């Protein structure tokens, strides 16, 4: 859309109204780049996003986003192979933290159905390793000691050396007290010195670093600390070198993910902008309009967002209506009405809410053109007329059936008779070309044109003859009338003079009486409409109250169900604990094999309550294709997601299978056949085993962050069994810090698991108390 219309309608000022609700620099940048579009799918997407965010706010009224700074330049530097500084790493750290918080929020969100917003939440990346690396930089811009063993070693040596310097100086302060001007340790040129009286300067061996202005005090670094100070200076240089090395190393770790982090930052900004739109809706009682497919416009109680105490009006621009001509005297708000229509349409096509009532509809226009100028503040002259006509000629050459045209004081600035004729001719040309137009004029000749011409409608701005002031109410279907006689009479002009004047234009008086009757009918209709709206608002409030009550009842129901599930889980936990003890006794007596213990536990775990999501049940979606199994078939063990091969069938119908290094006995329902063309292994949901090659041998990792307690404990148990089946020696369990409930549950589980040799928190630079490293018995 052309930039001129955006400047004319002051669209930038409108966008500025949303800025106070933004929390991120990415959101601010997207707001500033926002412009109207004629693509219906993009507008519909923006409207759907706002509606979903409104629903989200009903359940989570305090939803917020962590404030972030712009990182486009940082990511660009990474792509150019530059190393980042601490401040830049802190910007990235903030973005990753904001992304993690949004992912956790989405994972725990309930009672809200999201489609458009879900796409954005689910596109956010998870970088646990990078987040761990960036913990090396604290918010004060300091590299933590745990960033590397070398840095920690250097800083320990610096600390020890500085302690020695302090001890030596304190001893000298006591021993040489009479030789000092003050009993303190001073600092000169980064060195620790003693303030020695000039008369004793030769009594204390060392390096002179400064002399006072009076010459009475000499600042000497004692010989005893010179060597230590030099060591400290050397260590400081080593520290700086190591910090540069750390910056380079972490830059290399972050570099491959620069594009993904930049994309996450954009998504965070986009969600922030949607959130700001909804906050604006709440603050200004705005609405998300409906979208018309045929350029029909219906604005209910619409008002201009930049006008304080603006009067709300109704505007209906039907599908067949091509022009609305607002007639009547100036100063009544005609130009504001024109701008309100244009600006509302621009806001909607930019994906913004509008200041109107629910039920409002907007069209889609490829272009909006306007010739708007304040004719009352400039001298009427040929140059003014020429300027307007030049603009109109240019517009007439560009408009088409997909355009909206706004013309202010059409035909003004020249002879009234010629100006009125030109105005009618221009409107007729636009009507024949089926171009939607709203025009204002003070020429009375255009009233007749609006009445006599098909698909053209008159309109006016209401004037209160009692107060002699405009009310700024838009009266569609009613042409403007002159109030000169009424105003003159109220201002004290002789009734004789007013009577003589009215007799000279009796025909016009008849027209004015008709217009007056139309105004009365319009006012009566407006009152009835206002009453209907009041009833609608009451119904809307009642509907919201009922929805709120319904949601509260659902939440209470879910709470009770959760309590019941927790109680059931406790019972099952007790049963599993007892089963562990029984199996332990059996193992000690008959030396059962590990896989037999795991099989027994899997059968016991079937007692645990499971949540059934029918919407994701693939059995209900399509029939399961399956043939009879035979020896040599490749299978997938359903309990663990592990592949194996059938080796023989037992007499009781069960099958023996080789799964990795372990032989297992399975019922047919406990495995699925792998199709010949199937290449990818089946992944068990949320139990992500990642094998890595390192000096410690195979490892695995389980991420329990964002999970509920019951779900986390079930996944942990399955994960440990899988690790044992894979003959792994060590695994990592990421549980986060949070409230500590999951962490405590993990600890209790590991304490009672007889296969666990030892466990403990990860190093600080690998997750600290947010992760546990588990070592199994050999």
Swiss-Prot record:
SUPFAM superfamilies: DNA repair protein MutS, domain III, P-loop containing nucleoside triphosphate hydrolases, SMR domain-like. Its EC number is 3.1.-.-, 3.6.4.-. InterPro entries: DNA_mismatch_repair_MutS_C, DNA_mismatch_repair_MutS_core, DNA_mismatch_repair_MutS_sf, MSSS, MutS, MutS2, P-loop_NTPase, Smr_dom. Keywords: ATP-binding, DNA-binding, Endonuclease, Hydrolase, Nuclease, Nucleotide-binding, RNA-binding, rRNA-binding. GO terms for molecular function: ATP binding; ATP hydrolysis activity; ATP-dependent DNA damage sensor activity; endonuclease activity; mismatched DNA binding; ribosomal large subunit binding; rRNA binding. Endonuclease that is involved in the suppression of homologous recombination and thus may have a key role in the control of bacterial genetic diversity. Acts as a ribosome collision sensor, splitting the ribosome into its 2 subunits. Detects stalled/collided 70S ribosomes which it binds and splits by an ATP-hydrolysis driven conformational change. Acts upstream of the ribosome quality control system (RQC), a ribosome-associated complex that mediates the extraction of incompletely synthesized nascent chains from stalled ribosomes and their subsequent degradation. Probably generates substrates for RQC. This is Endonuclease MutS2. It comes from Streptococcus pneumoniae (strain ATCC 700669 / Spain 23F-1).
